[in-house]
UniProtKB/Swiss-Prot annotation:
This is Myosin tail region-interacting protein MTI1. Residues 234-301, 356-430 form a coiled coil. GO terms for molecular function: myosin I binding; myosin I tail binding. The gene is BBC1. CDD domains: SH3_Bbc1. The keyword tRNA processing does not apply. Residues 5-69 form the SH3 domain.
Length: 1157
């Protein structure tokens, strides 16, 4: 069909929508003006929408129809309508105009014709009435007659005109009468076949018989046919529409209706009947075989005793046939017994139904397989069966023994039984039986009694001794000279078994294990390989204690936990120990020398008591390794069980002796006269201790120090006795003696001349003693030398280093046990004065564990701020701001866990720092390189005496939406002197928020985000963050992005190794307007030709990739997004299945009320 010339109109037959920008989308019945024809399948056109905008694009031809064709149809139909109108109007013209000019002859001719029916009463459809050309002709004739013209183009009496008029004047509503049932003369009227179609589907009238030999018979048949009524011809359209039923339809209705299940059941029934018939044949064959076998057994029974006697006599001169006579009868008799059992079971089950027969048939085949397997196993260790079957039809079994297992045909079993029977009959003549021909050419043993149980027992015993018998039994020599022994499959397999036998005989000793078994034993768990490595390098047991914990925790969890908890209790004592306290180490060599490994255990315990790492799990690791091997029972008993518990108890006693020794040595150091030299000696070994253990002991160690506190009360009465020797070496002490008695008043009576004595009682903490020592150092005349001598004192009293610079309310949220606070409660007064310590003391004491001094800090926060001491500590504030390595180390070890880092953030306040006055981020948070939002609220309070106080709240919102609030209260005139602090932490609200709230946020903000994103498509914005720019427009309503990578509540978090199946619920929650963030991801784009392309997305860690989600296509499993690509806003898509590495998250913008702001 040729296309019309452009431009032309087309009408949409179907709605068309496409995602491509060049395509023209339209709805059904839309009129489109085609401006150009692109090719054989596409048009290019345009139309005006409801807003008056002209939209243009390409669209397929199959969706539209050319409007010109419809116009042509209307043009064709318009003459029809005009003719009908002319025809309806024309009768009125004839009635009015014809009576006067028409002559009587003409009137008679017109009246004699058929009377026309008025058009008003006859509705004539335009589609069914042909073009009435005769009507126009008659109207022209009447017009000529009325005009008076005697000339007529067409005479009225012409038959041609009458025929035309009669055709259009008849009533078209009258139906053509159907042919009535009439008697047809078959001789004169031929039968016409009205249907040219498939014969079986449509009716075909019977043909005229041509077999008539005479006219009488033909007339007779005609009379019979006259009585029959010939049915009316059938229209094919009526048959197909279903209005008339044929004979085939009647036959189909008469057939029974069956469902698919019924057909399957019928098919199964047929299969079952077929199986039953086959079973019947097998049963008949088996009965015949059993009858032959019974007759053979009954014939051989009378001769069994004589045969056995003769057999025993003939075994000595012919030893080569001994295994033959011993083992030849086993498979034969077992097969006979099996067939007897199957026969009895079959006879018992003859009355069962068909289903039981099928089950029985399956059992029968399984039993045959078992019998054949047992025969094949026996044949490997017995060479007699070979020679009995070499000469007679052994061609069927020259294959492997595996073929015997697979054969289930009863015919093969029957042949085997027949061969066995013939072998028995042939051997009977040699032992007194009737003489018969032996077709095998060799002697064959006669079976014993056909009892089944003894044979089975012997068979089991021989299976166990089979490896030894294969070596000891002599090989049978074939009798026939033409038989090659190497061609026998049994002989070949016996050789193979002999070749493999030496490797198997090595493992017969139950106490010895092969290397393969040891490998399997170690292969049962991967931890044993690690254990072996640790045994090879025992010197790394302390450093690799964490790995040992994982390796051997499943071995003895209770012992490991008990040791670990005990070492943790002694952990703080081990930190306070120094080389001058070595008396406890001599206890370990006194343990009974159980083994070399127990000595290593004790050595490990000593190292763990001295090291700050202090992990005791290496103690149990060598024990569990020895116990796992299980080869030496004595060693396992000595290491595991009671001896191991004994070593633990001894170690516990050692720890207690070390703690008591520590308290005694501390008292001796504090109360001895030459105190300075002793402390200087202690300082040297402490300097050698590496500072790395400090961060590893933060939380629970202060608890074990509680038991040592009760031992403090008996010590205070001792100082008066030792006051005389202690006073001479310290002359400048009396001037400062006024302060110490007041401080130690709760526990010690006021003794002015002996200030150093009161601090001695609490040995593990030793806080009062060291505080007073610091005061003595500050007030004494030779300040520098004394500070150097007392510098290492924190080794015996570690809680001091951080206490001096700490303000009262800084460590309010330290997670410390309550027991530590209760035991350290009596010492708050010394801490108030400790804040006045010198900066040199503080700078030299930063290695002390934070867990112990947290208790002192708890005490200090209960006191009001000591203002005078703050002005003299600019250096202390600097050192204190640097004392946050604990949090920094957590950041380094858990870089990817933002939640854990933010939960451990703690601001250590120093009033001399200016960040809280300048309203900037504190160094404790900014140094961690955490992403957060900070907002500050100031509240002014007016008080009496014209004072104006300020309550300043710092709110820090981290990426997991957990918060830290740091509140400061100070006088606006003197903030540094009057400031007090309080910090609180609030968890993330994500878990508590419901999906309903997130859906509300999606309705509020997502539509705006999508609308704004679509408006920016194809625009150039440069290197700006596209998503942050959009979110910033709702600054007063929503939470702003954190670090350009957290944009709200997390809807989806995905890593390629996790799989997509688990994300279906999360993917269903994604809505247009959500934010997609991708970090360090690699997508593998598949191409039809060439190599796959690797695309890197979000490799910039400072500013990861972010875009606006417009849709998630579940059919293609990909995100459709709007993104910033090299400064231009475009549309793109990313498939999750193409993502090979990295991390992907989907966020939803939330309101400020989501976090309580």
């Amino acid at each position: 069909m040729s296309e019309p010339e452009v431009p032309f109109k087309v009408v949409a037959q179907f709605p068309y929508k496409s995602d491509y920008e060049d395509d023209l989308n339209f709805e059904k019945d839309q009129e489109i003006i085609v401006t150009s024809v692109e090719d054989a399948e596409w048009y290019f056109g345009e139309y005006q929408d409801s807003n008056g905008d002209v939209i243009e694009g390409i669209f397929p031809k199959s969706f539209v129809a050319v409007q010109g064709s419809e116009v042509g149809k209307e043009a064709e139909s318009s003459p029809n309508t005009g003719s009908t109108e002319q025809r309806t109007i024309q009768p009125e013209v004839e009635q009015k105009d014809l009576p006067e000019p028409i002559s009587p002859e003409t009137k008679k001719e017109t009246l004699s014709g058929p009377v026309p029916v008025p058009a008003a009463t006859v509705p004539v459809p335009a589609a069914t009435v042909p073009v009435p050309a005769a009507t126009a002709v008659s109207a022209q004739v009447q017009h000529d007659s009325s005009s008076g013209n005697g000339e007529r183009k067409v005479p009225m009496d012409s038959p041609k005109l009458k025929a035309r008029l009669s055709m259009f004047n008849q009533d078209i509503t009258e139906q053509v009468p159907l042919p009535k049932s009439t008697h047809l003369d078959l001789e004169n009227i031929p039968v016409k076949k009205t249907i040219v179609a498939d014969a079986p589907k449509y009716y075909v009238p019977p043909g005229i018989p041509t077999n008539d030999t005479s006219n009488l018979e033909r007339k007779k048949s005609l009379k019979e046919n006259e009585k029959k009524i010939v049915p009316e011809p059938i229209n094919r359209a009526q048959v197909e529409s279903g209005r008339i039923e044929t004979e085939n339809d009647q036959l189909k209705k008469d057939l029974p209706q069956m469902s698919l299940k019924e057909r399957i059941a019928l098919l199964q029934e047929q299969q079952r009947l077929q199986a039953a018939r086959e079973e019947e044949l097998l049963r008949k064959k088996a009965k015949l075989e059993q009858e032959h076998e019974r007759s053979a057994v009954n014939k051989n029974e009378p001769y069994t005793e004589t045969e056995e006697a003769e057999e025993n006599e003939k075994t000595e001169p012919k030893p080569e046939f001994t295994p033959e006579t011993e083992h030849n009868e086993e498979p034969q008799m077992e097969l006979l017994a099996h067939k007897e059992i199957t026969k009895t079971s079959r006879e018992a089950d003859e009355g069962t139904n068909d289903i039981e027969k099928e089950q029985f048939l399956d059992e029968y085949t399984k039993e045959n397989q078992k019998v054949e397997e047992s025969q094949a196993d026996e044949a490997r260790g017995e060479n007699v069966a070979e020679e009995s079957e070499i000469g007679y039809g052994h061609e069927d079994r020259e294959g492997d023994n595996d073929e015997e297992k697979e054969e289930e045909d009863s015919e093969e079993n029957r042949r085997a039984a027949l061969r066995e029977r013939m072998a028995k009959l042939s051997g009977a003549s040699r032992f007194g039986a009737p003489v018969g021909f032996n077709p095998f050419g060799m002697a064959s043993g006669v079976g014993n009694k056909p009892s089944e149980e003894p044979k089975k027992k012997q068979h089991k015993e021989k299976e166990e001794e089979e490896p030894e018998q294969l070596q000891e039994l002599p090989r049978a020599i074939p009798v026939m000279p033409f038989v090659d022994p190497s061609s026998n499959p049994f002989f070949r397999k016996s050789n193979l078994s002999e070749k493999n036998q030496p490797t198997e005989t090595k493992t017969l000793d139950p106490h010895a294990t092969t290397e393969h078994e040891q490998k399997q034993e170690h292969g049962t768990h991967a931890y044993h390989n690690l254990a072996a490595v640790d045994n090879a390098h025992p010197e790394y047991s302390d450093h690799d204690s964490d790995e040992d914990t994982d390796d051997h925790e499943f071995e003895d969890a209770n012992d490991g936990l008990r040791k670990h908890s005990m070492v943790e209790q002694a952990f703080q004592i081990g930190n306070n120990e120094s080389e001058n306290v070595n008396s406890g180490e001599k206890i370990y060599p006194q343990e009974p020398p159980i083994s070399h490994r127990t000595a290593e255990v004790s050595h490990d315990i000593e190292n763990s008591s001295q090291n700050t790492t202090g992990n005791v799990l290496p103690v149990s690791s060598p024990q569990t390794r020895v116990a796992r091997n299980g080869s030496i029972n004595s060693l396992t008993k000595s290491i595991s069980g009671e001896n191991r518990r004994k070593s633990i108890n001894e170690y516990h006693d050692t720890v207690s002796t070390n703690s008591s020794a520590l308290t005694e040595t501390a008292q001796d150091i504090s109360m001895a006269a030459p105190a300075a030299p002793v402390l200087s000696k202690v300082s040297h070994p402490e300097d050698k201790v590496p500072p790395h253990p400090v961060p590893s002991a933060p939380s629970a160690p202060p608890v074990p120090s509680a038991p040592s506190v009760p031992s403090a009360p008996p010590v205070p009465p001792a100082p008066p006795a030792l006051s005389a020797p202690s006073v001479p070496p310290v002359p400048p002490v009396p001037p400062v003696s006024s302060a110490p008695p007041a401080l130690s008043a709760p526990s010690i009576p006021p003794v002015p001349p002996t200030p150093p004595a009161p601090p001695a009682p609490p040995a593990p903490l030793a806080l009062p003693k060291h505080n007073e020592v610091e005061e003595h150092v500050k007030s004494s005349a030779p300040l520098p030398p004394v500070s150097e001598e007392y510098h290492p004192m924190p080794n015996t009293a570690p809680p001091l280093p951080r206490a001096p610079p700490v303000p009262p309310a800084t460590f309010e949220f330290d997670s410390e046990p309550t027991a530590t606070h209760s035991h350290t409660a009596p010492s708050p007064p010394p801490h108030q004065n400790v804040t006045a310590s010198t900066p040199s003391m503080m700078s030299t004491q930063q290695r002390v564990p934070t867990s112990v001094l947290s208790g002192a800090e708890k005490e200090s926060r209960t006191l009001p701020p000591h203002v005078p001491s703050l002005t003299n500590r600019p250096v202390d504030s600097f050192h204190e701001s640097d004392t946050t390595p604990k949090v920094a180390s957590i950041r380094r070890s858990t870089t990817h866990d933002v939640g854990e880092i933010s939960n451990n953030v703690k601001i250590e306040f120093n009033a001399q720092e200016r960040w809280w006055i300048n309203k900037s981020a504190p160094p404790a948070i900014s140094n961690l390189k955490l992403n957060f939002l900070m907002e500050i609220d100031d509240h002014f309070i007016s008080k009496r005496l014209h004072q104006k106080w300020v309550v300043r709240d710092f709110y820090f919102l981290f990426e997991n939406y957990s918060q830290l609030r740091f509140s400061l209260t100070f006088n606006s005139t003197s903030p540094e002197k009057t400031v007090t602090t309080l910090q609180e932490r609030f968890p993330s609200p994500v878990e508590t928020q419901s999906a309903r709230i997130l859906d509300e946020y999606a309705q509020r903000f997502n539509a705006k985000v999508v609308e704004k994103s679509h408006s920016l498509i194809n625009s150039h914005i440069g290197a700006k963050n596209f998503v942050s720019q959009i979110v910033s427009e709702f600054k007063d309503e929503v939470i702003q992005p954190i670090g350009a990578r957290t944009f709200g509540a997390t809807i989806l978090s995905y890593k390629p190794e996790e799989g997509i199946e688990q994300l279906m619920k999360s993917l269903q929650k994604i809505k247009p307007g959500d934010i997609l963030v991708i970090r360090k991801a690699k997508f593998e784009a598949h191409k039809k030709i060439g190599k796959n392309e690797i695309i890197n997305v979000g490799m910039d860690s400072a500013a990861p990739y972010s875009s606006v989600v417009t849709d998630y296509d579940f059919t293609k499993n990909k995100f459709r997004v709007i993104e910033n690509h090299e400064g231009k806003i475009i549309q793109n898509s990313y498939k999750l299945s193409h993502m090979k590495s990295g991390k992907l998250k989907v966020f939803r913008i939330v309101a400020r009320g989501y976090v309580g702001w």
